Design a protein with these regions (language model features):
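Acidic, negatively charged sequence tracts
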Residues: 1-196
Length: 196
């Protein structure tokens, strides 16, 4: 599990001011916590963490000498400014199932030469105990052919008895569709209209 250093946040200081000072704000919450704990994380540490981790990742937060095993629940990201604004963490409790998501990563799509691989689902929603959490599902699509599709029920996570799948097993993850050459089709249509 990755470790991320954080500090308890003084709520007197506004989030905008903290961001200007190089921090990302966040909250830690959980069943065994009396109330959520506002935190701040150095912006550089948060950005480095999210180069390899994402929503659904497990992380140990080091907060003033205390280690808390958590799950990344939400990431508020400003895509225009390309910066992380806020992160919510759920404290994990041994023996308690938590709701999470696993990111779907397609592998070898460049090997498919009978069509184009179309990714239709980015993540799978599920419930599991902390020790059974899954961050990423890698799907090898290299052997797929035109007309083939992969559904959630075909993924390894669907066969895992320790995981309660929340996404519909019949949901299509990816399929291979025909390549349409729209420029040629448009030219042919225009030629047909002119001939009429």
């Amino acid at each position: 599990m990755t470790t991320l250093k954080a500090e308890k946040r003084d709520m007197q200081t506004k989030a905008k001011k903290l961001r200007r000072e190089g921090f990302v704000t966040g909250n830690v919450f959980g069943r065994e916590m009396k109330e959520s704990m506002p935190i701040q994380i150095a912006k550089n540490d948060a950005e480095r963490f999210f180069k390899t981790c994402t929503k659904g990742s497990k992380v140990t937060l080091e907060i003033e000498g205390q280690s808390i095993a958590t799950l990344v629940k939400e990431i508020d990201y400003d895509s225009l400014k390309r910066q992380i604004l806020e992160i919510d963490f759920q404290a994990l409790v041994k023996g308690e199932k938590v709701h999470s998501v696993a990111e779907i990563v397609l592998l070898n799509h460049e090997k498919v030469n009978t069509g184009v691989v179309e990714k239709l689902l980015d993540e799978v929603s599920y419930r599991a105990l902390p020790e059974s959490l899954v961050e990423k599902i890698e799907v090898d699509v290299g052997d797929m052919k035109l007309g083939d599709s992969i559904k959630v029920k075909d993924l390894p996570i669907a066969a895992d008895k320790d995981i309660d799948l929340l996404t519909d097993p019949e949901t299509v993850v990816a399929n291979v569709t025909a390549v349409h050459n729209t420029v040629e089709e448009t030219a042919e249509e225009e030629a047909g209209e002119t001939a009429q």
